[in-house]
A protein has these predicted regions:
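Hydrophobic/aromatic-enriched cytosolic interaction surfaces used to assemble or bind macromolecules
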Residues: 1-288
Length: 288
């Protein structure tokens, strides 16, 4: 079972990635999460199921820091946590941290970098309690960009790079990967309401396209990588021809995801994309 706990509900996925009906979105305010999740677990027969919880983009921060010499992977997160004291708006003692590799071929002479993920300890405790009280067994906590990385990696059959844009109601997220390696993740400040509103649509599309192009340019100029030729787009409003609207302003080709090619018989509810992606298998990044 994979869950993404959002301010307006719970996105879930359980299955083998062969049908869209194995995912869903349970709309609820935070105060009603616990009883509604417990009901969902009982209805689906998930009691005791190993569970991954994914943190949405706005519930964690990621920083690139140089990896200290002589530290084991086991000690790395705790050691680097204290280097975040000037970067966080809360004390490192109230943070829970983990690390994942920064691509060595993108460090551009900055040494051996790692990505340090930080979230509030209170948030982590709340999620552990929520999952446990519902009868699930928490296996791991993931973050949105690594979940989306799984999906981008699956689509990057050539290994030359893939960009994926996921548009939510209030913001978007763009990730760029090469195979299983995440190179870049960016928040895109655009709302679905602005994209739908006739008076604000053109400005919103241009703003979204500009942020996407800037991310592609950064990937090329600052990370020293050849940008992907296409960007795959996932949005909740499938009637809006966003791909063609954005393509006028972005150098790469813009394509909507072909869900049939992903083994689904109908399009996935975009609200479930992160939970669905978190359950995808991903190949290990090549060792250095």
């Amino acid at each position: 079972v994979c869950l993404e706990i959002l301010p307006d509900g719970i996105a879930w996925f359980c299955g083998n990635h062969s049908a869209a009906d194995q995912s869903g979105f349970l709309a609820c305010p935070p105060a009603k999460r616990a009883p509604l999740l417990a009901d969902l677990v009982a209805q689906q027969g998930w009691t005791g199921a190993p569970t991954t919880v994914v943190l949405p983009l706005d519930q964690y921060s990621v920083f690139q820091l140089e990896r200290p010499d002589g530290l084991s992977d086991h000690d790395l997160a705790d050691a680097l946590r204290w280097k975040l004291k000037d970067l966080l708006d809360y004390s490192p003692s109230n943070a829970v941290c983990d690390v994942f590799d920064f691509p060595h071929d993108a460090s551009r002479g900055r040494g051996h970098l790692v990505n340090v993920v930080s979230a509030r300890k209170t948030l982590a405790k709340e999620l552990v309690a929520l999952v446990s009280d519902a009868g699930l067994e928490l296996k791991r906590v993931d973050v949105a960009e690594l979940a989306l990385r799984n999906f981008a990696a699956q689509m990057d059959t050539s290994g030359r790079g893939m960009a994926l844009v996921h548009l939510r109601d209030g913001y978007g997220q763009m990730v760029i990967c090469k195979g299983p390696v995440l190179y870049l993740s960016r928040r895109l400040d655009v709302s679905a309401e602005d994209l739908r509103d006739a008076g604000r649509q053109e400005s919103a599309v241009q703003s979204l396209a500009l942020e996407m192009q800037r991310s592609l340019d950064y990937f090329e100029s600052q990370l020293g990588q050849v940008p992907p030729r296409s960007v795959r787009l996932v949005a909740r409003d499938t009637k809006l021809p966003l791909a063609s609207m954005i393509s006028n302003y972005v150098a790469a080709g813009i394509e909507t995801v072909d869900w049939g090619a992903q083994g689904l018989t109908e399009p996935l509810d975009s609200r479930c994309l992160v939970a669905w992606s978190a359950a995808l298998p991903v190949a290990e990044a090549p060792s250095r």
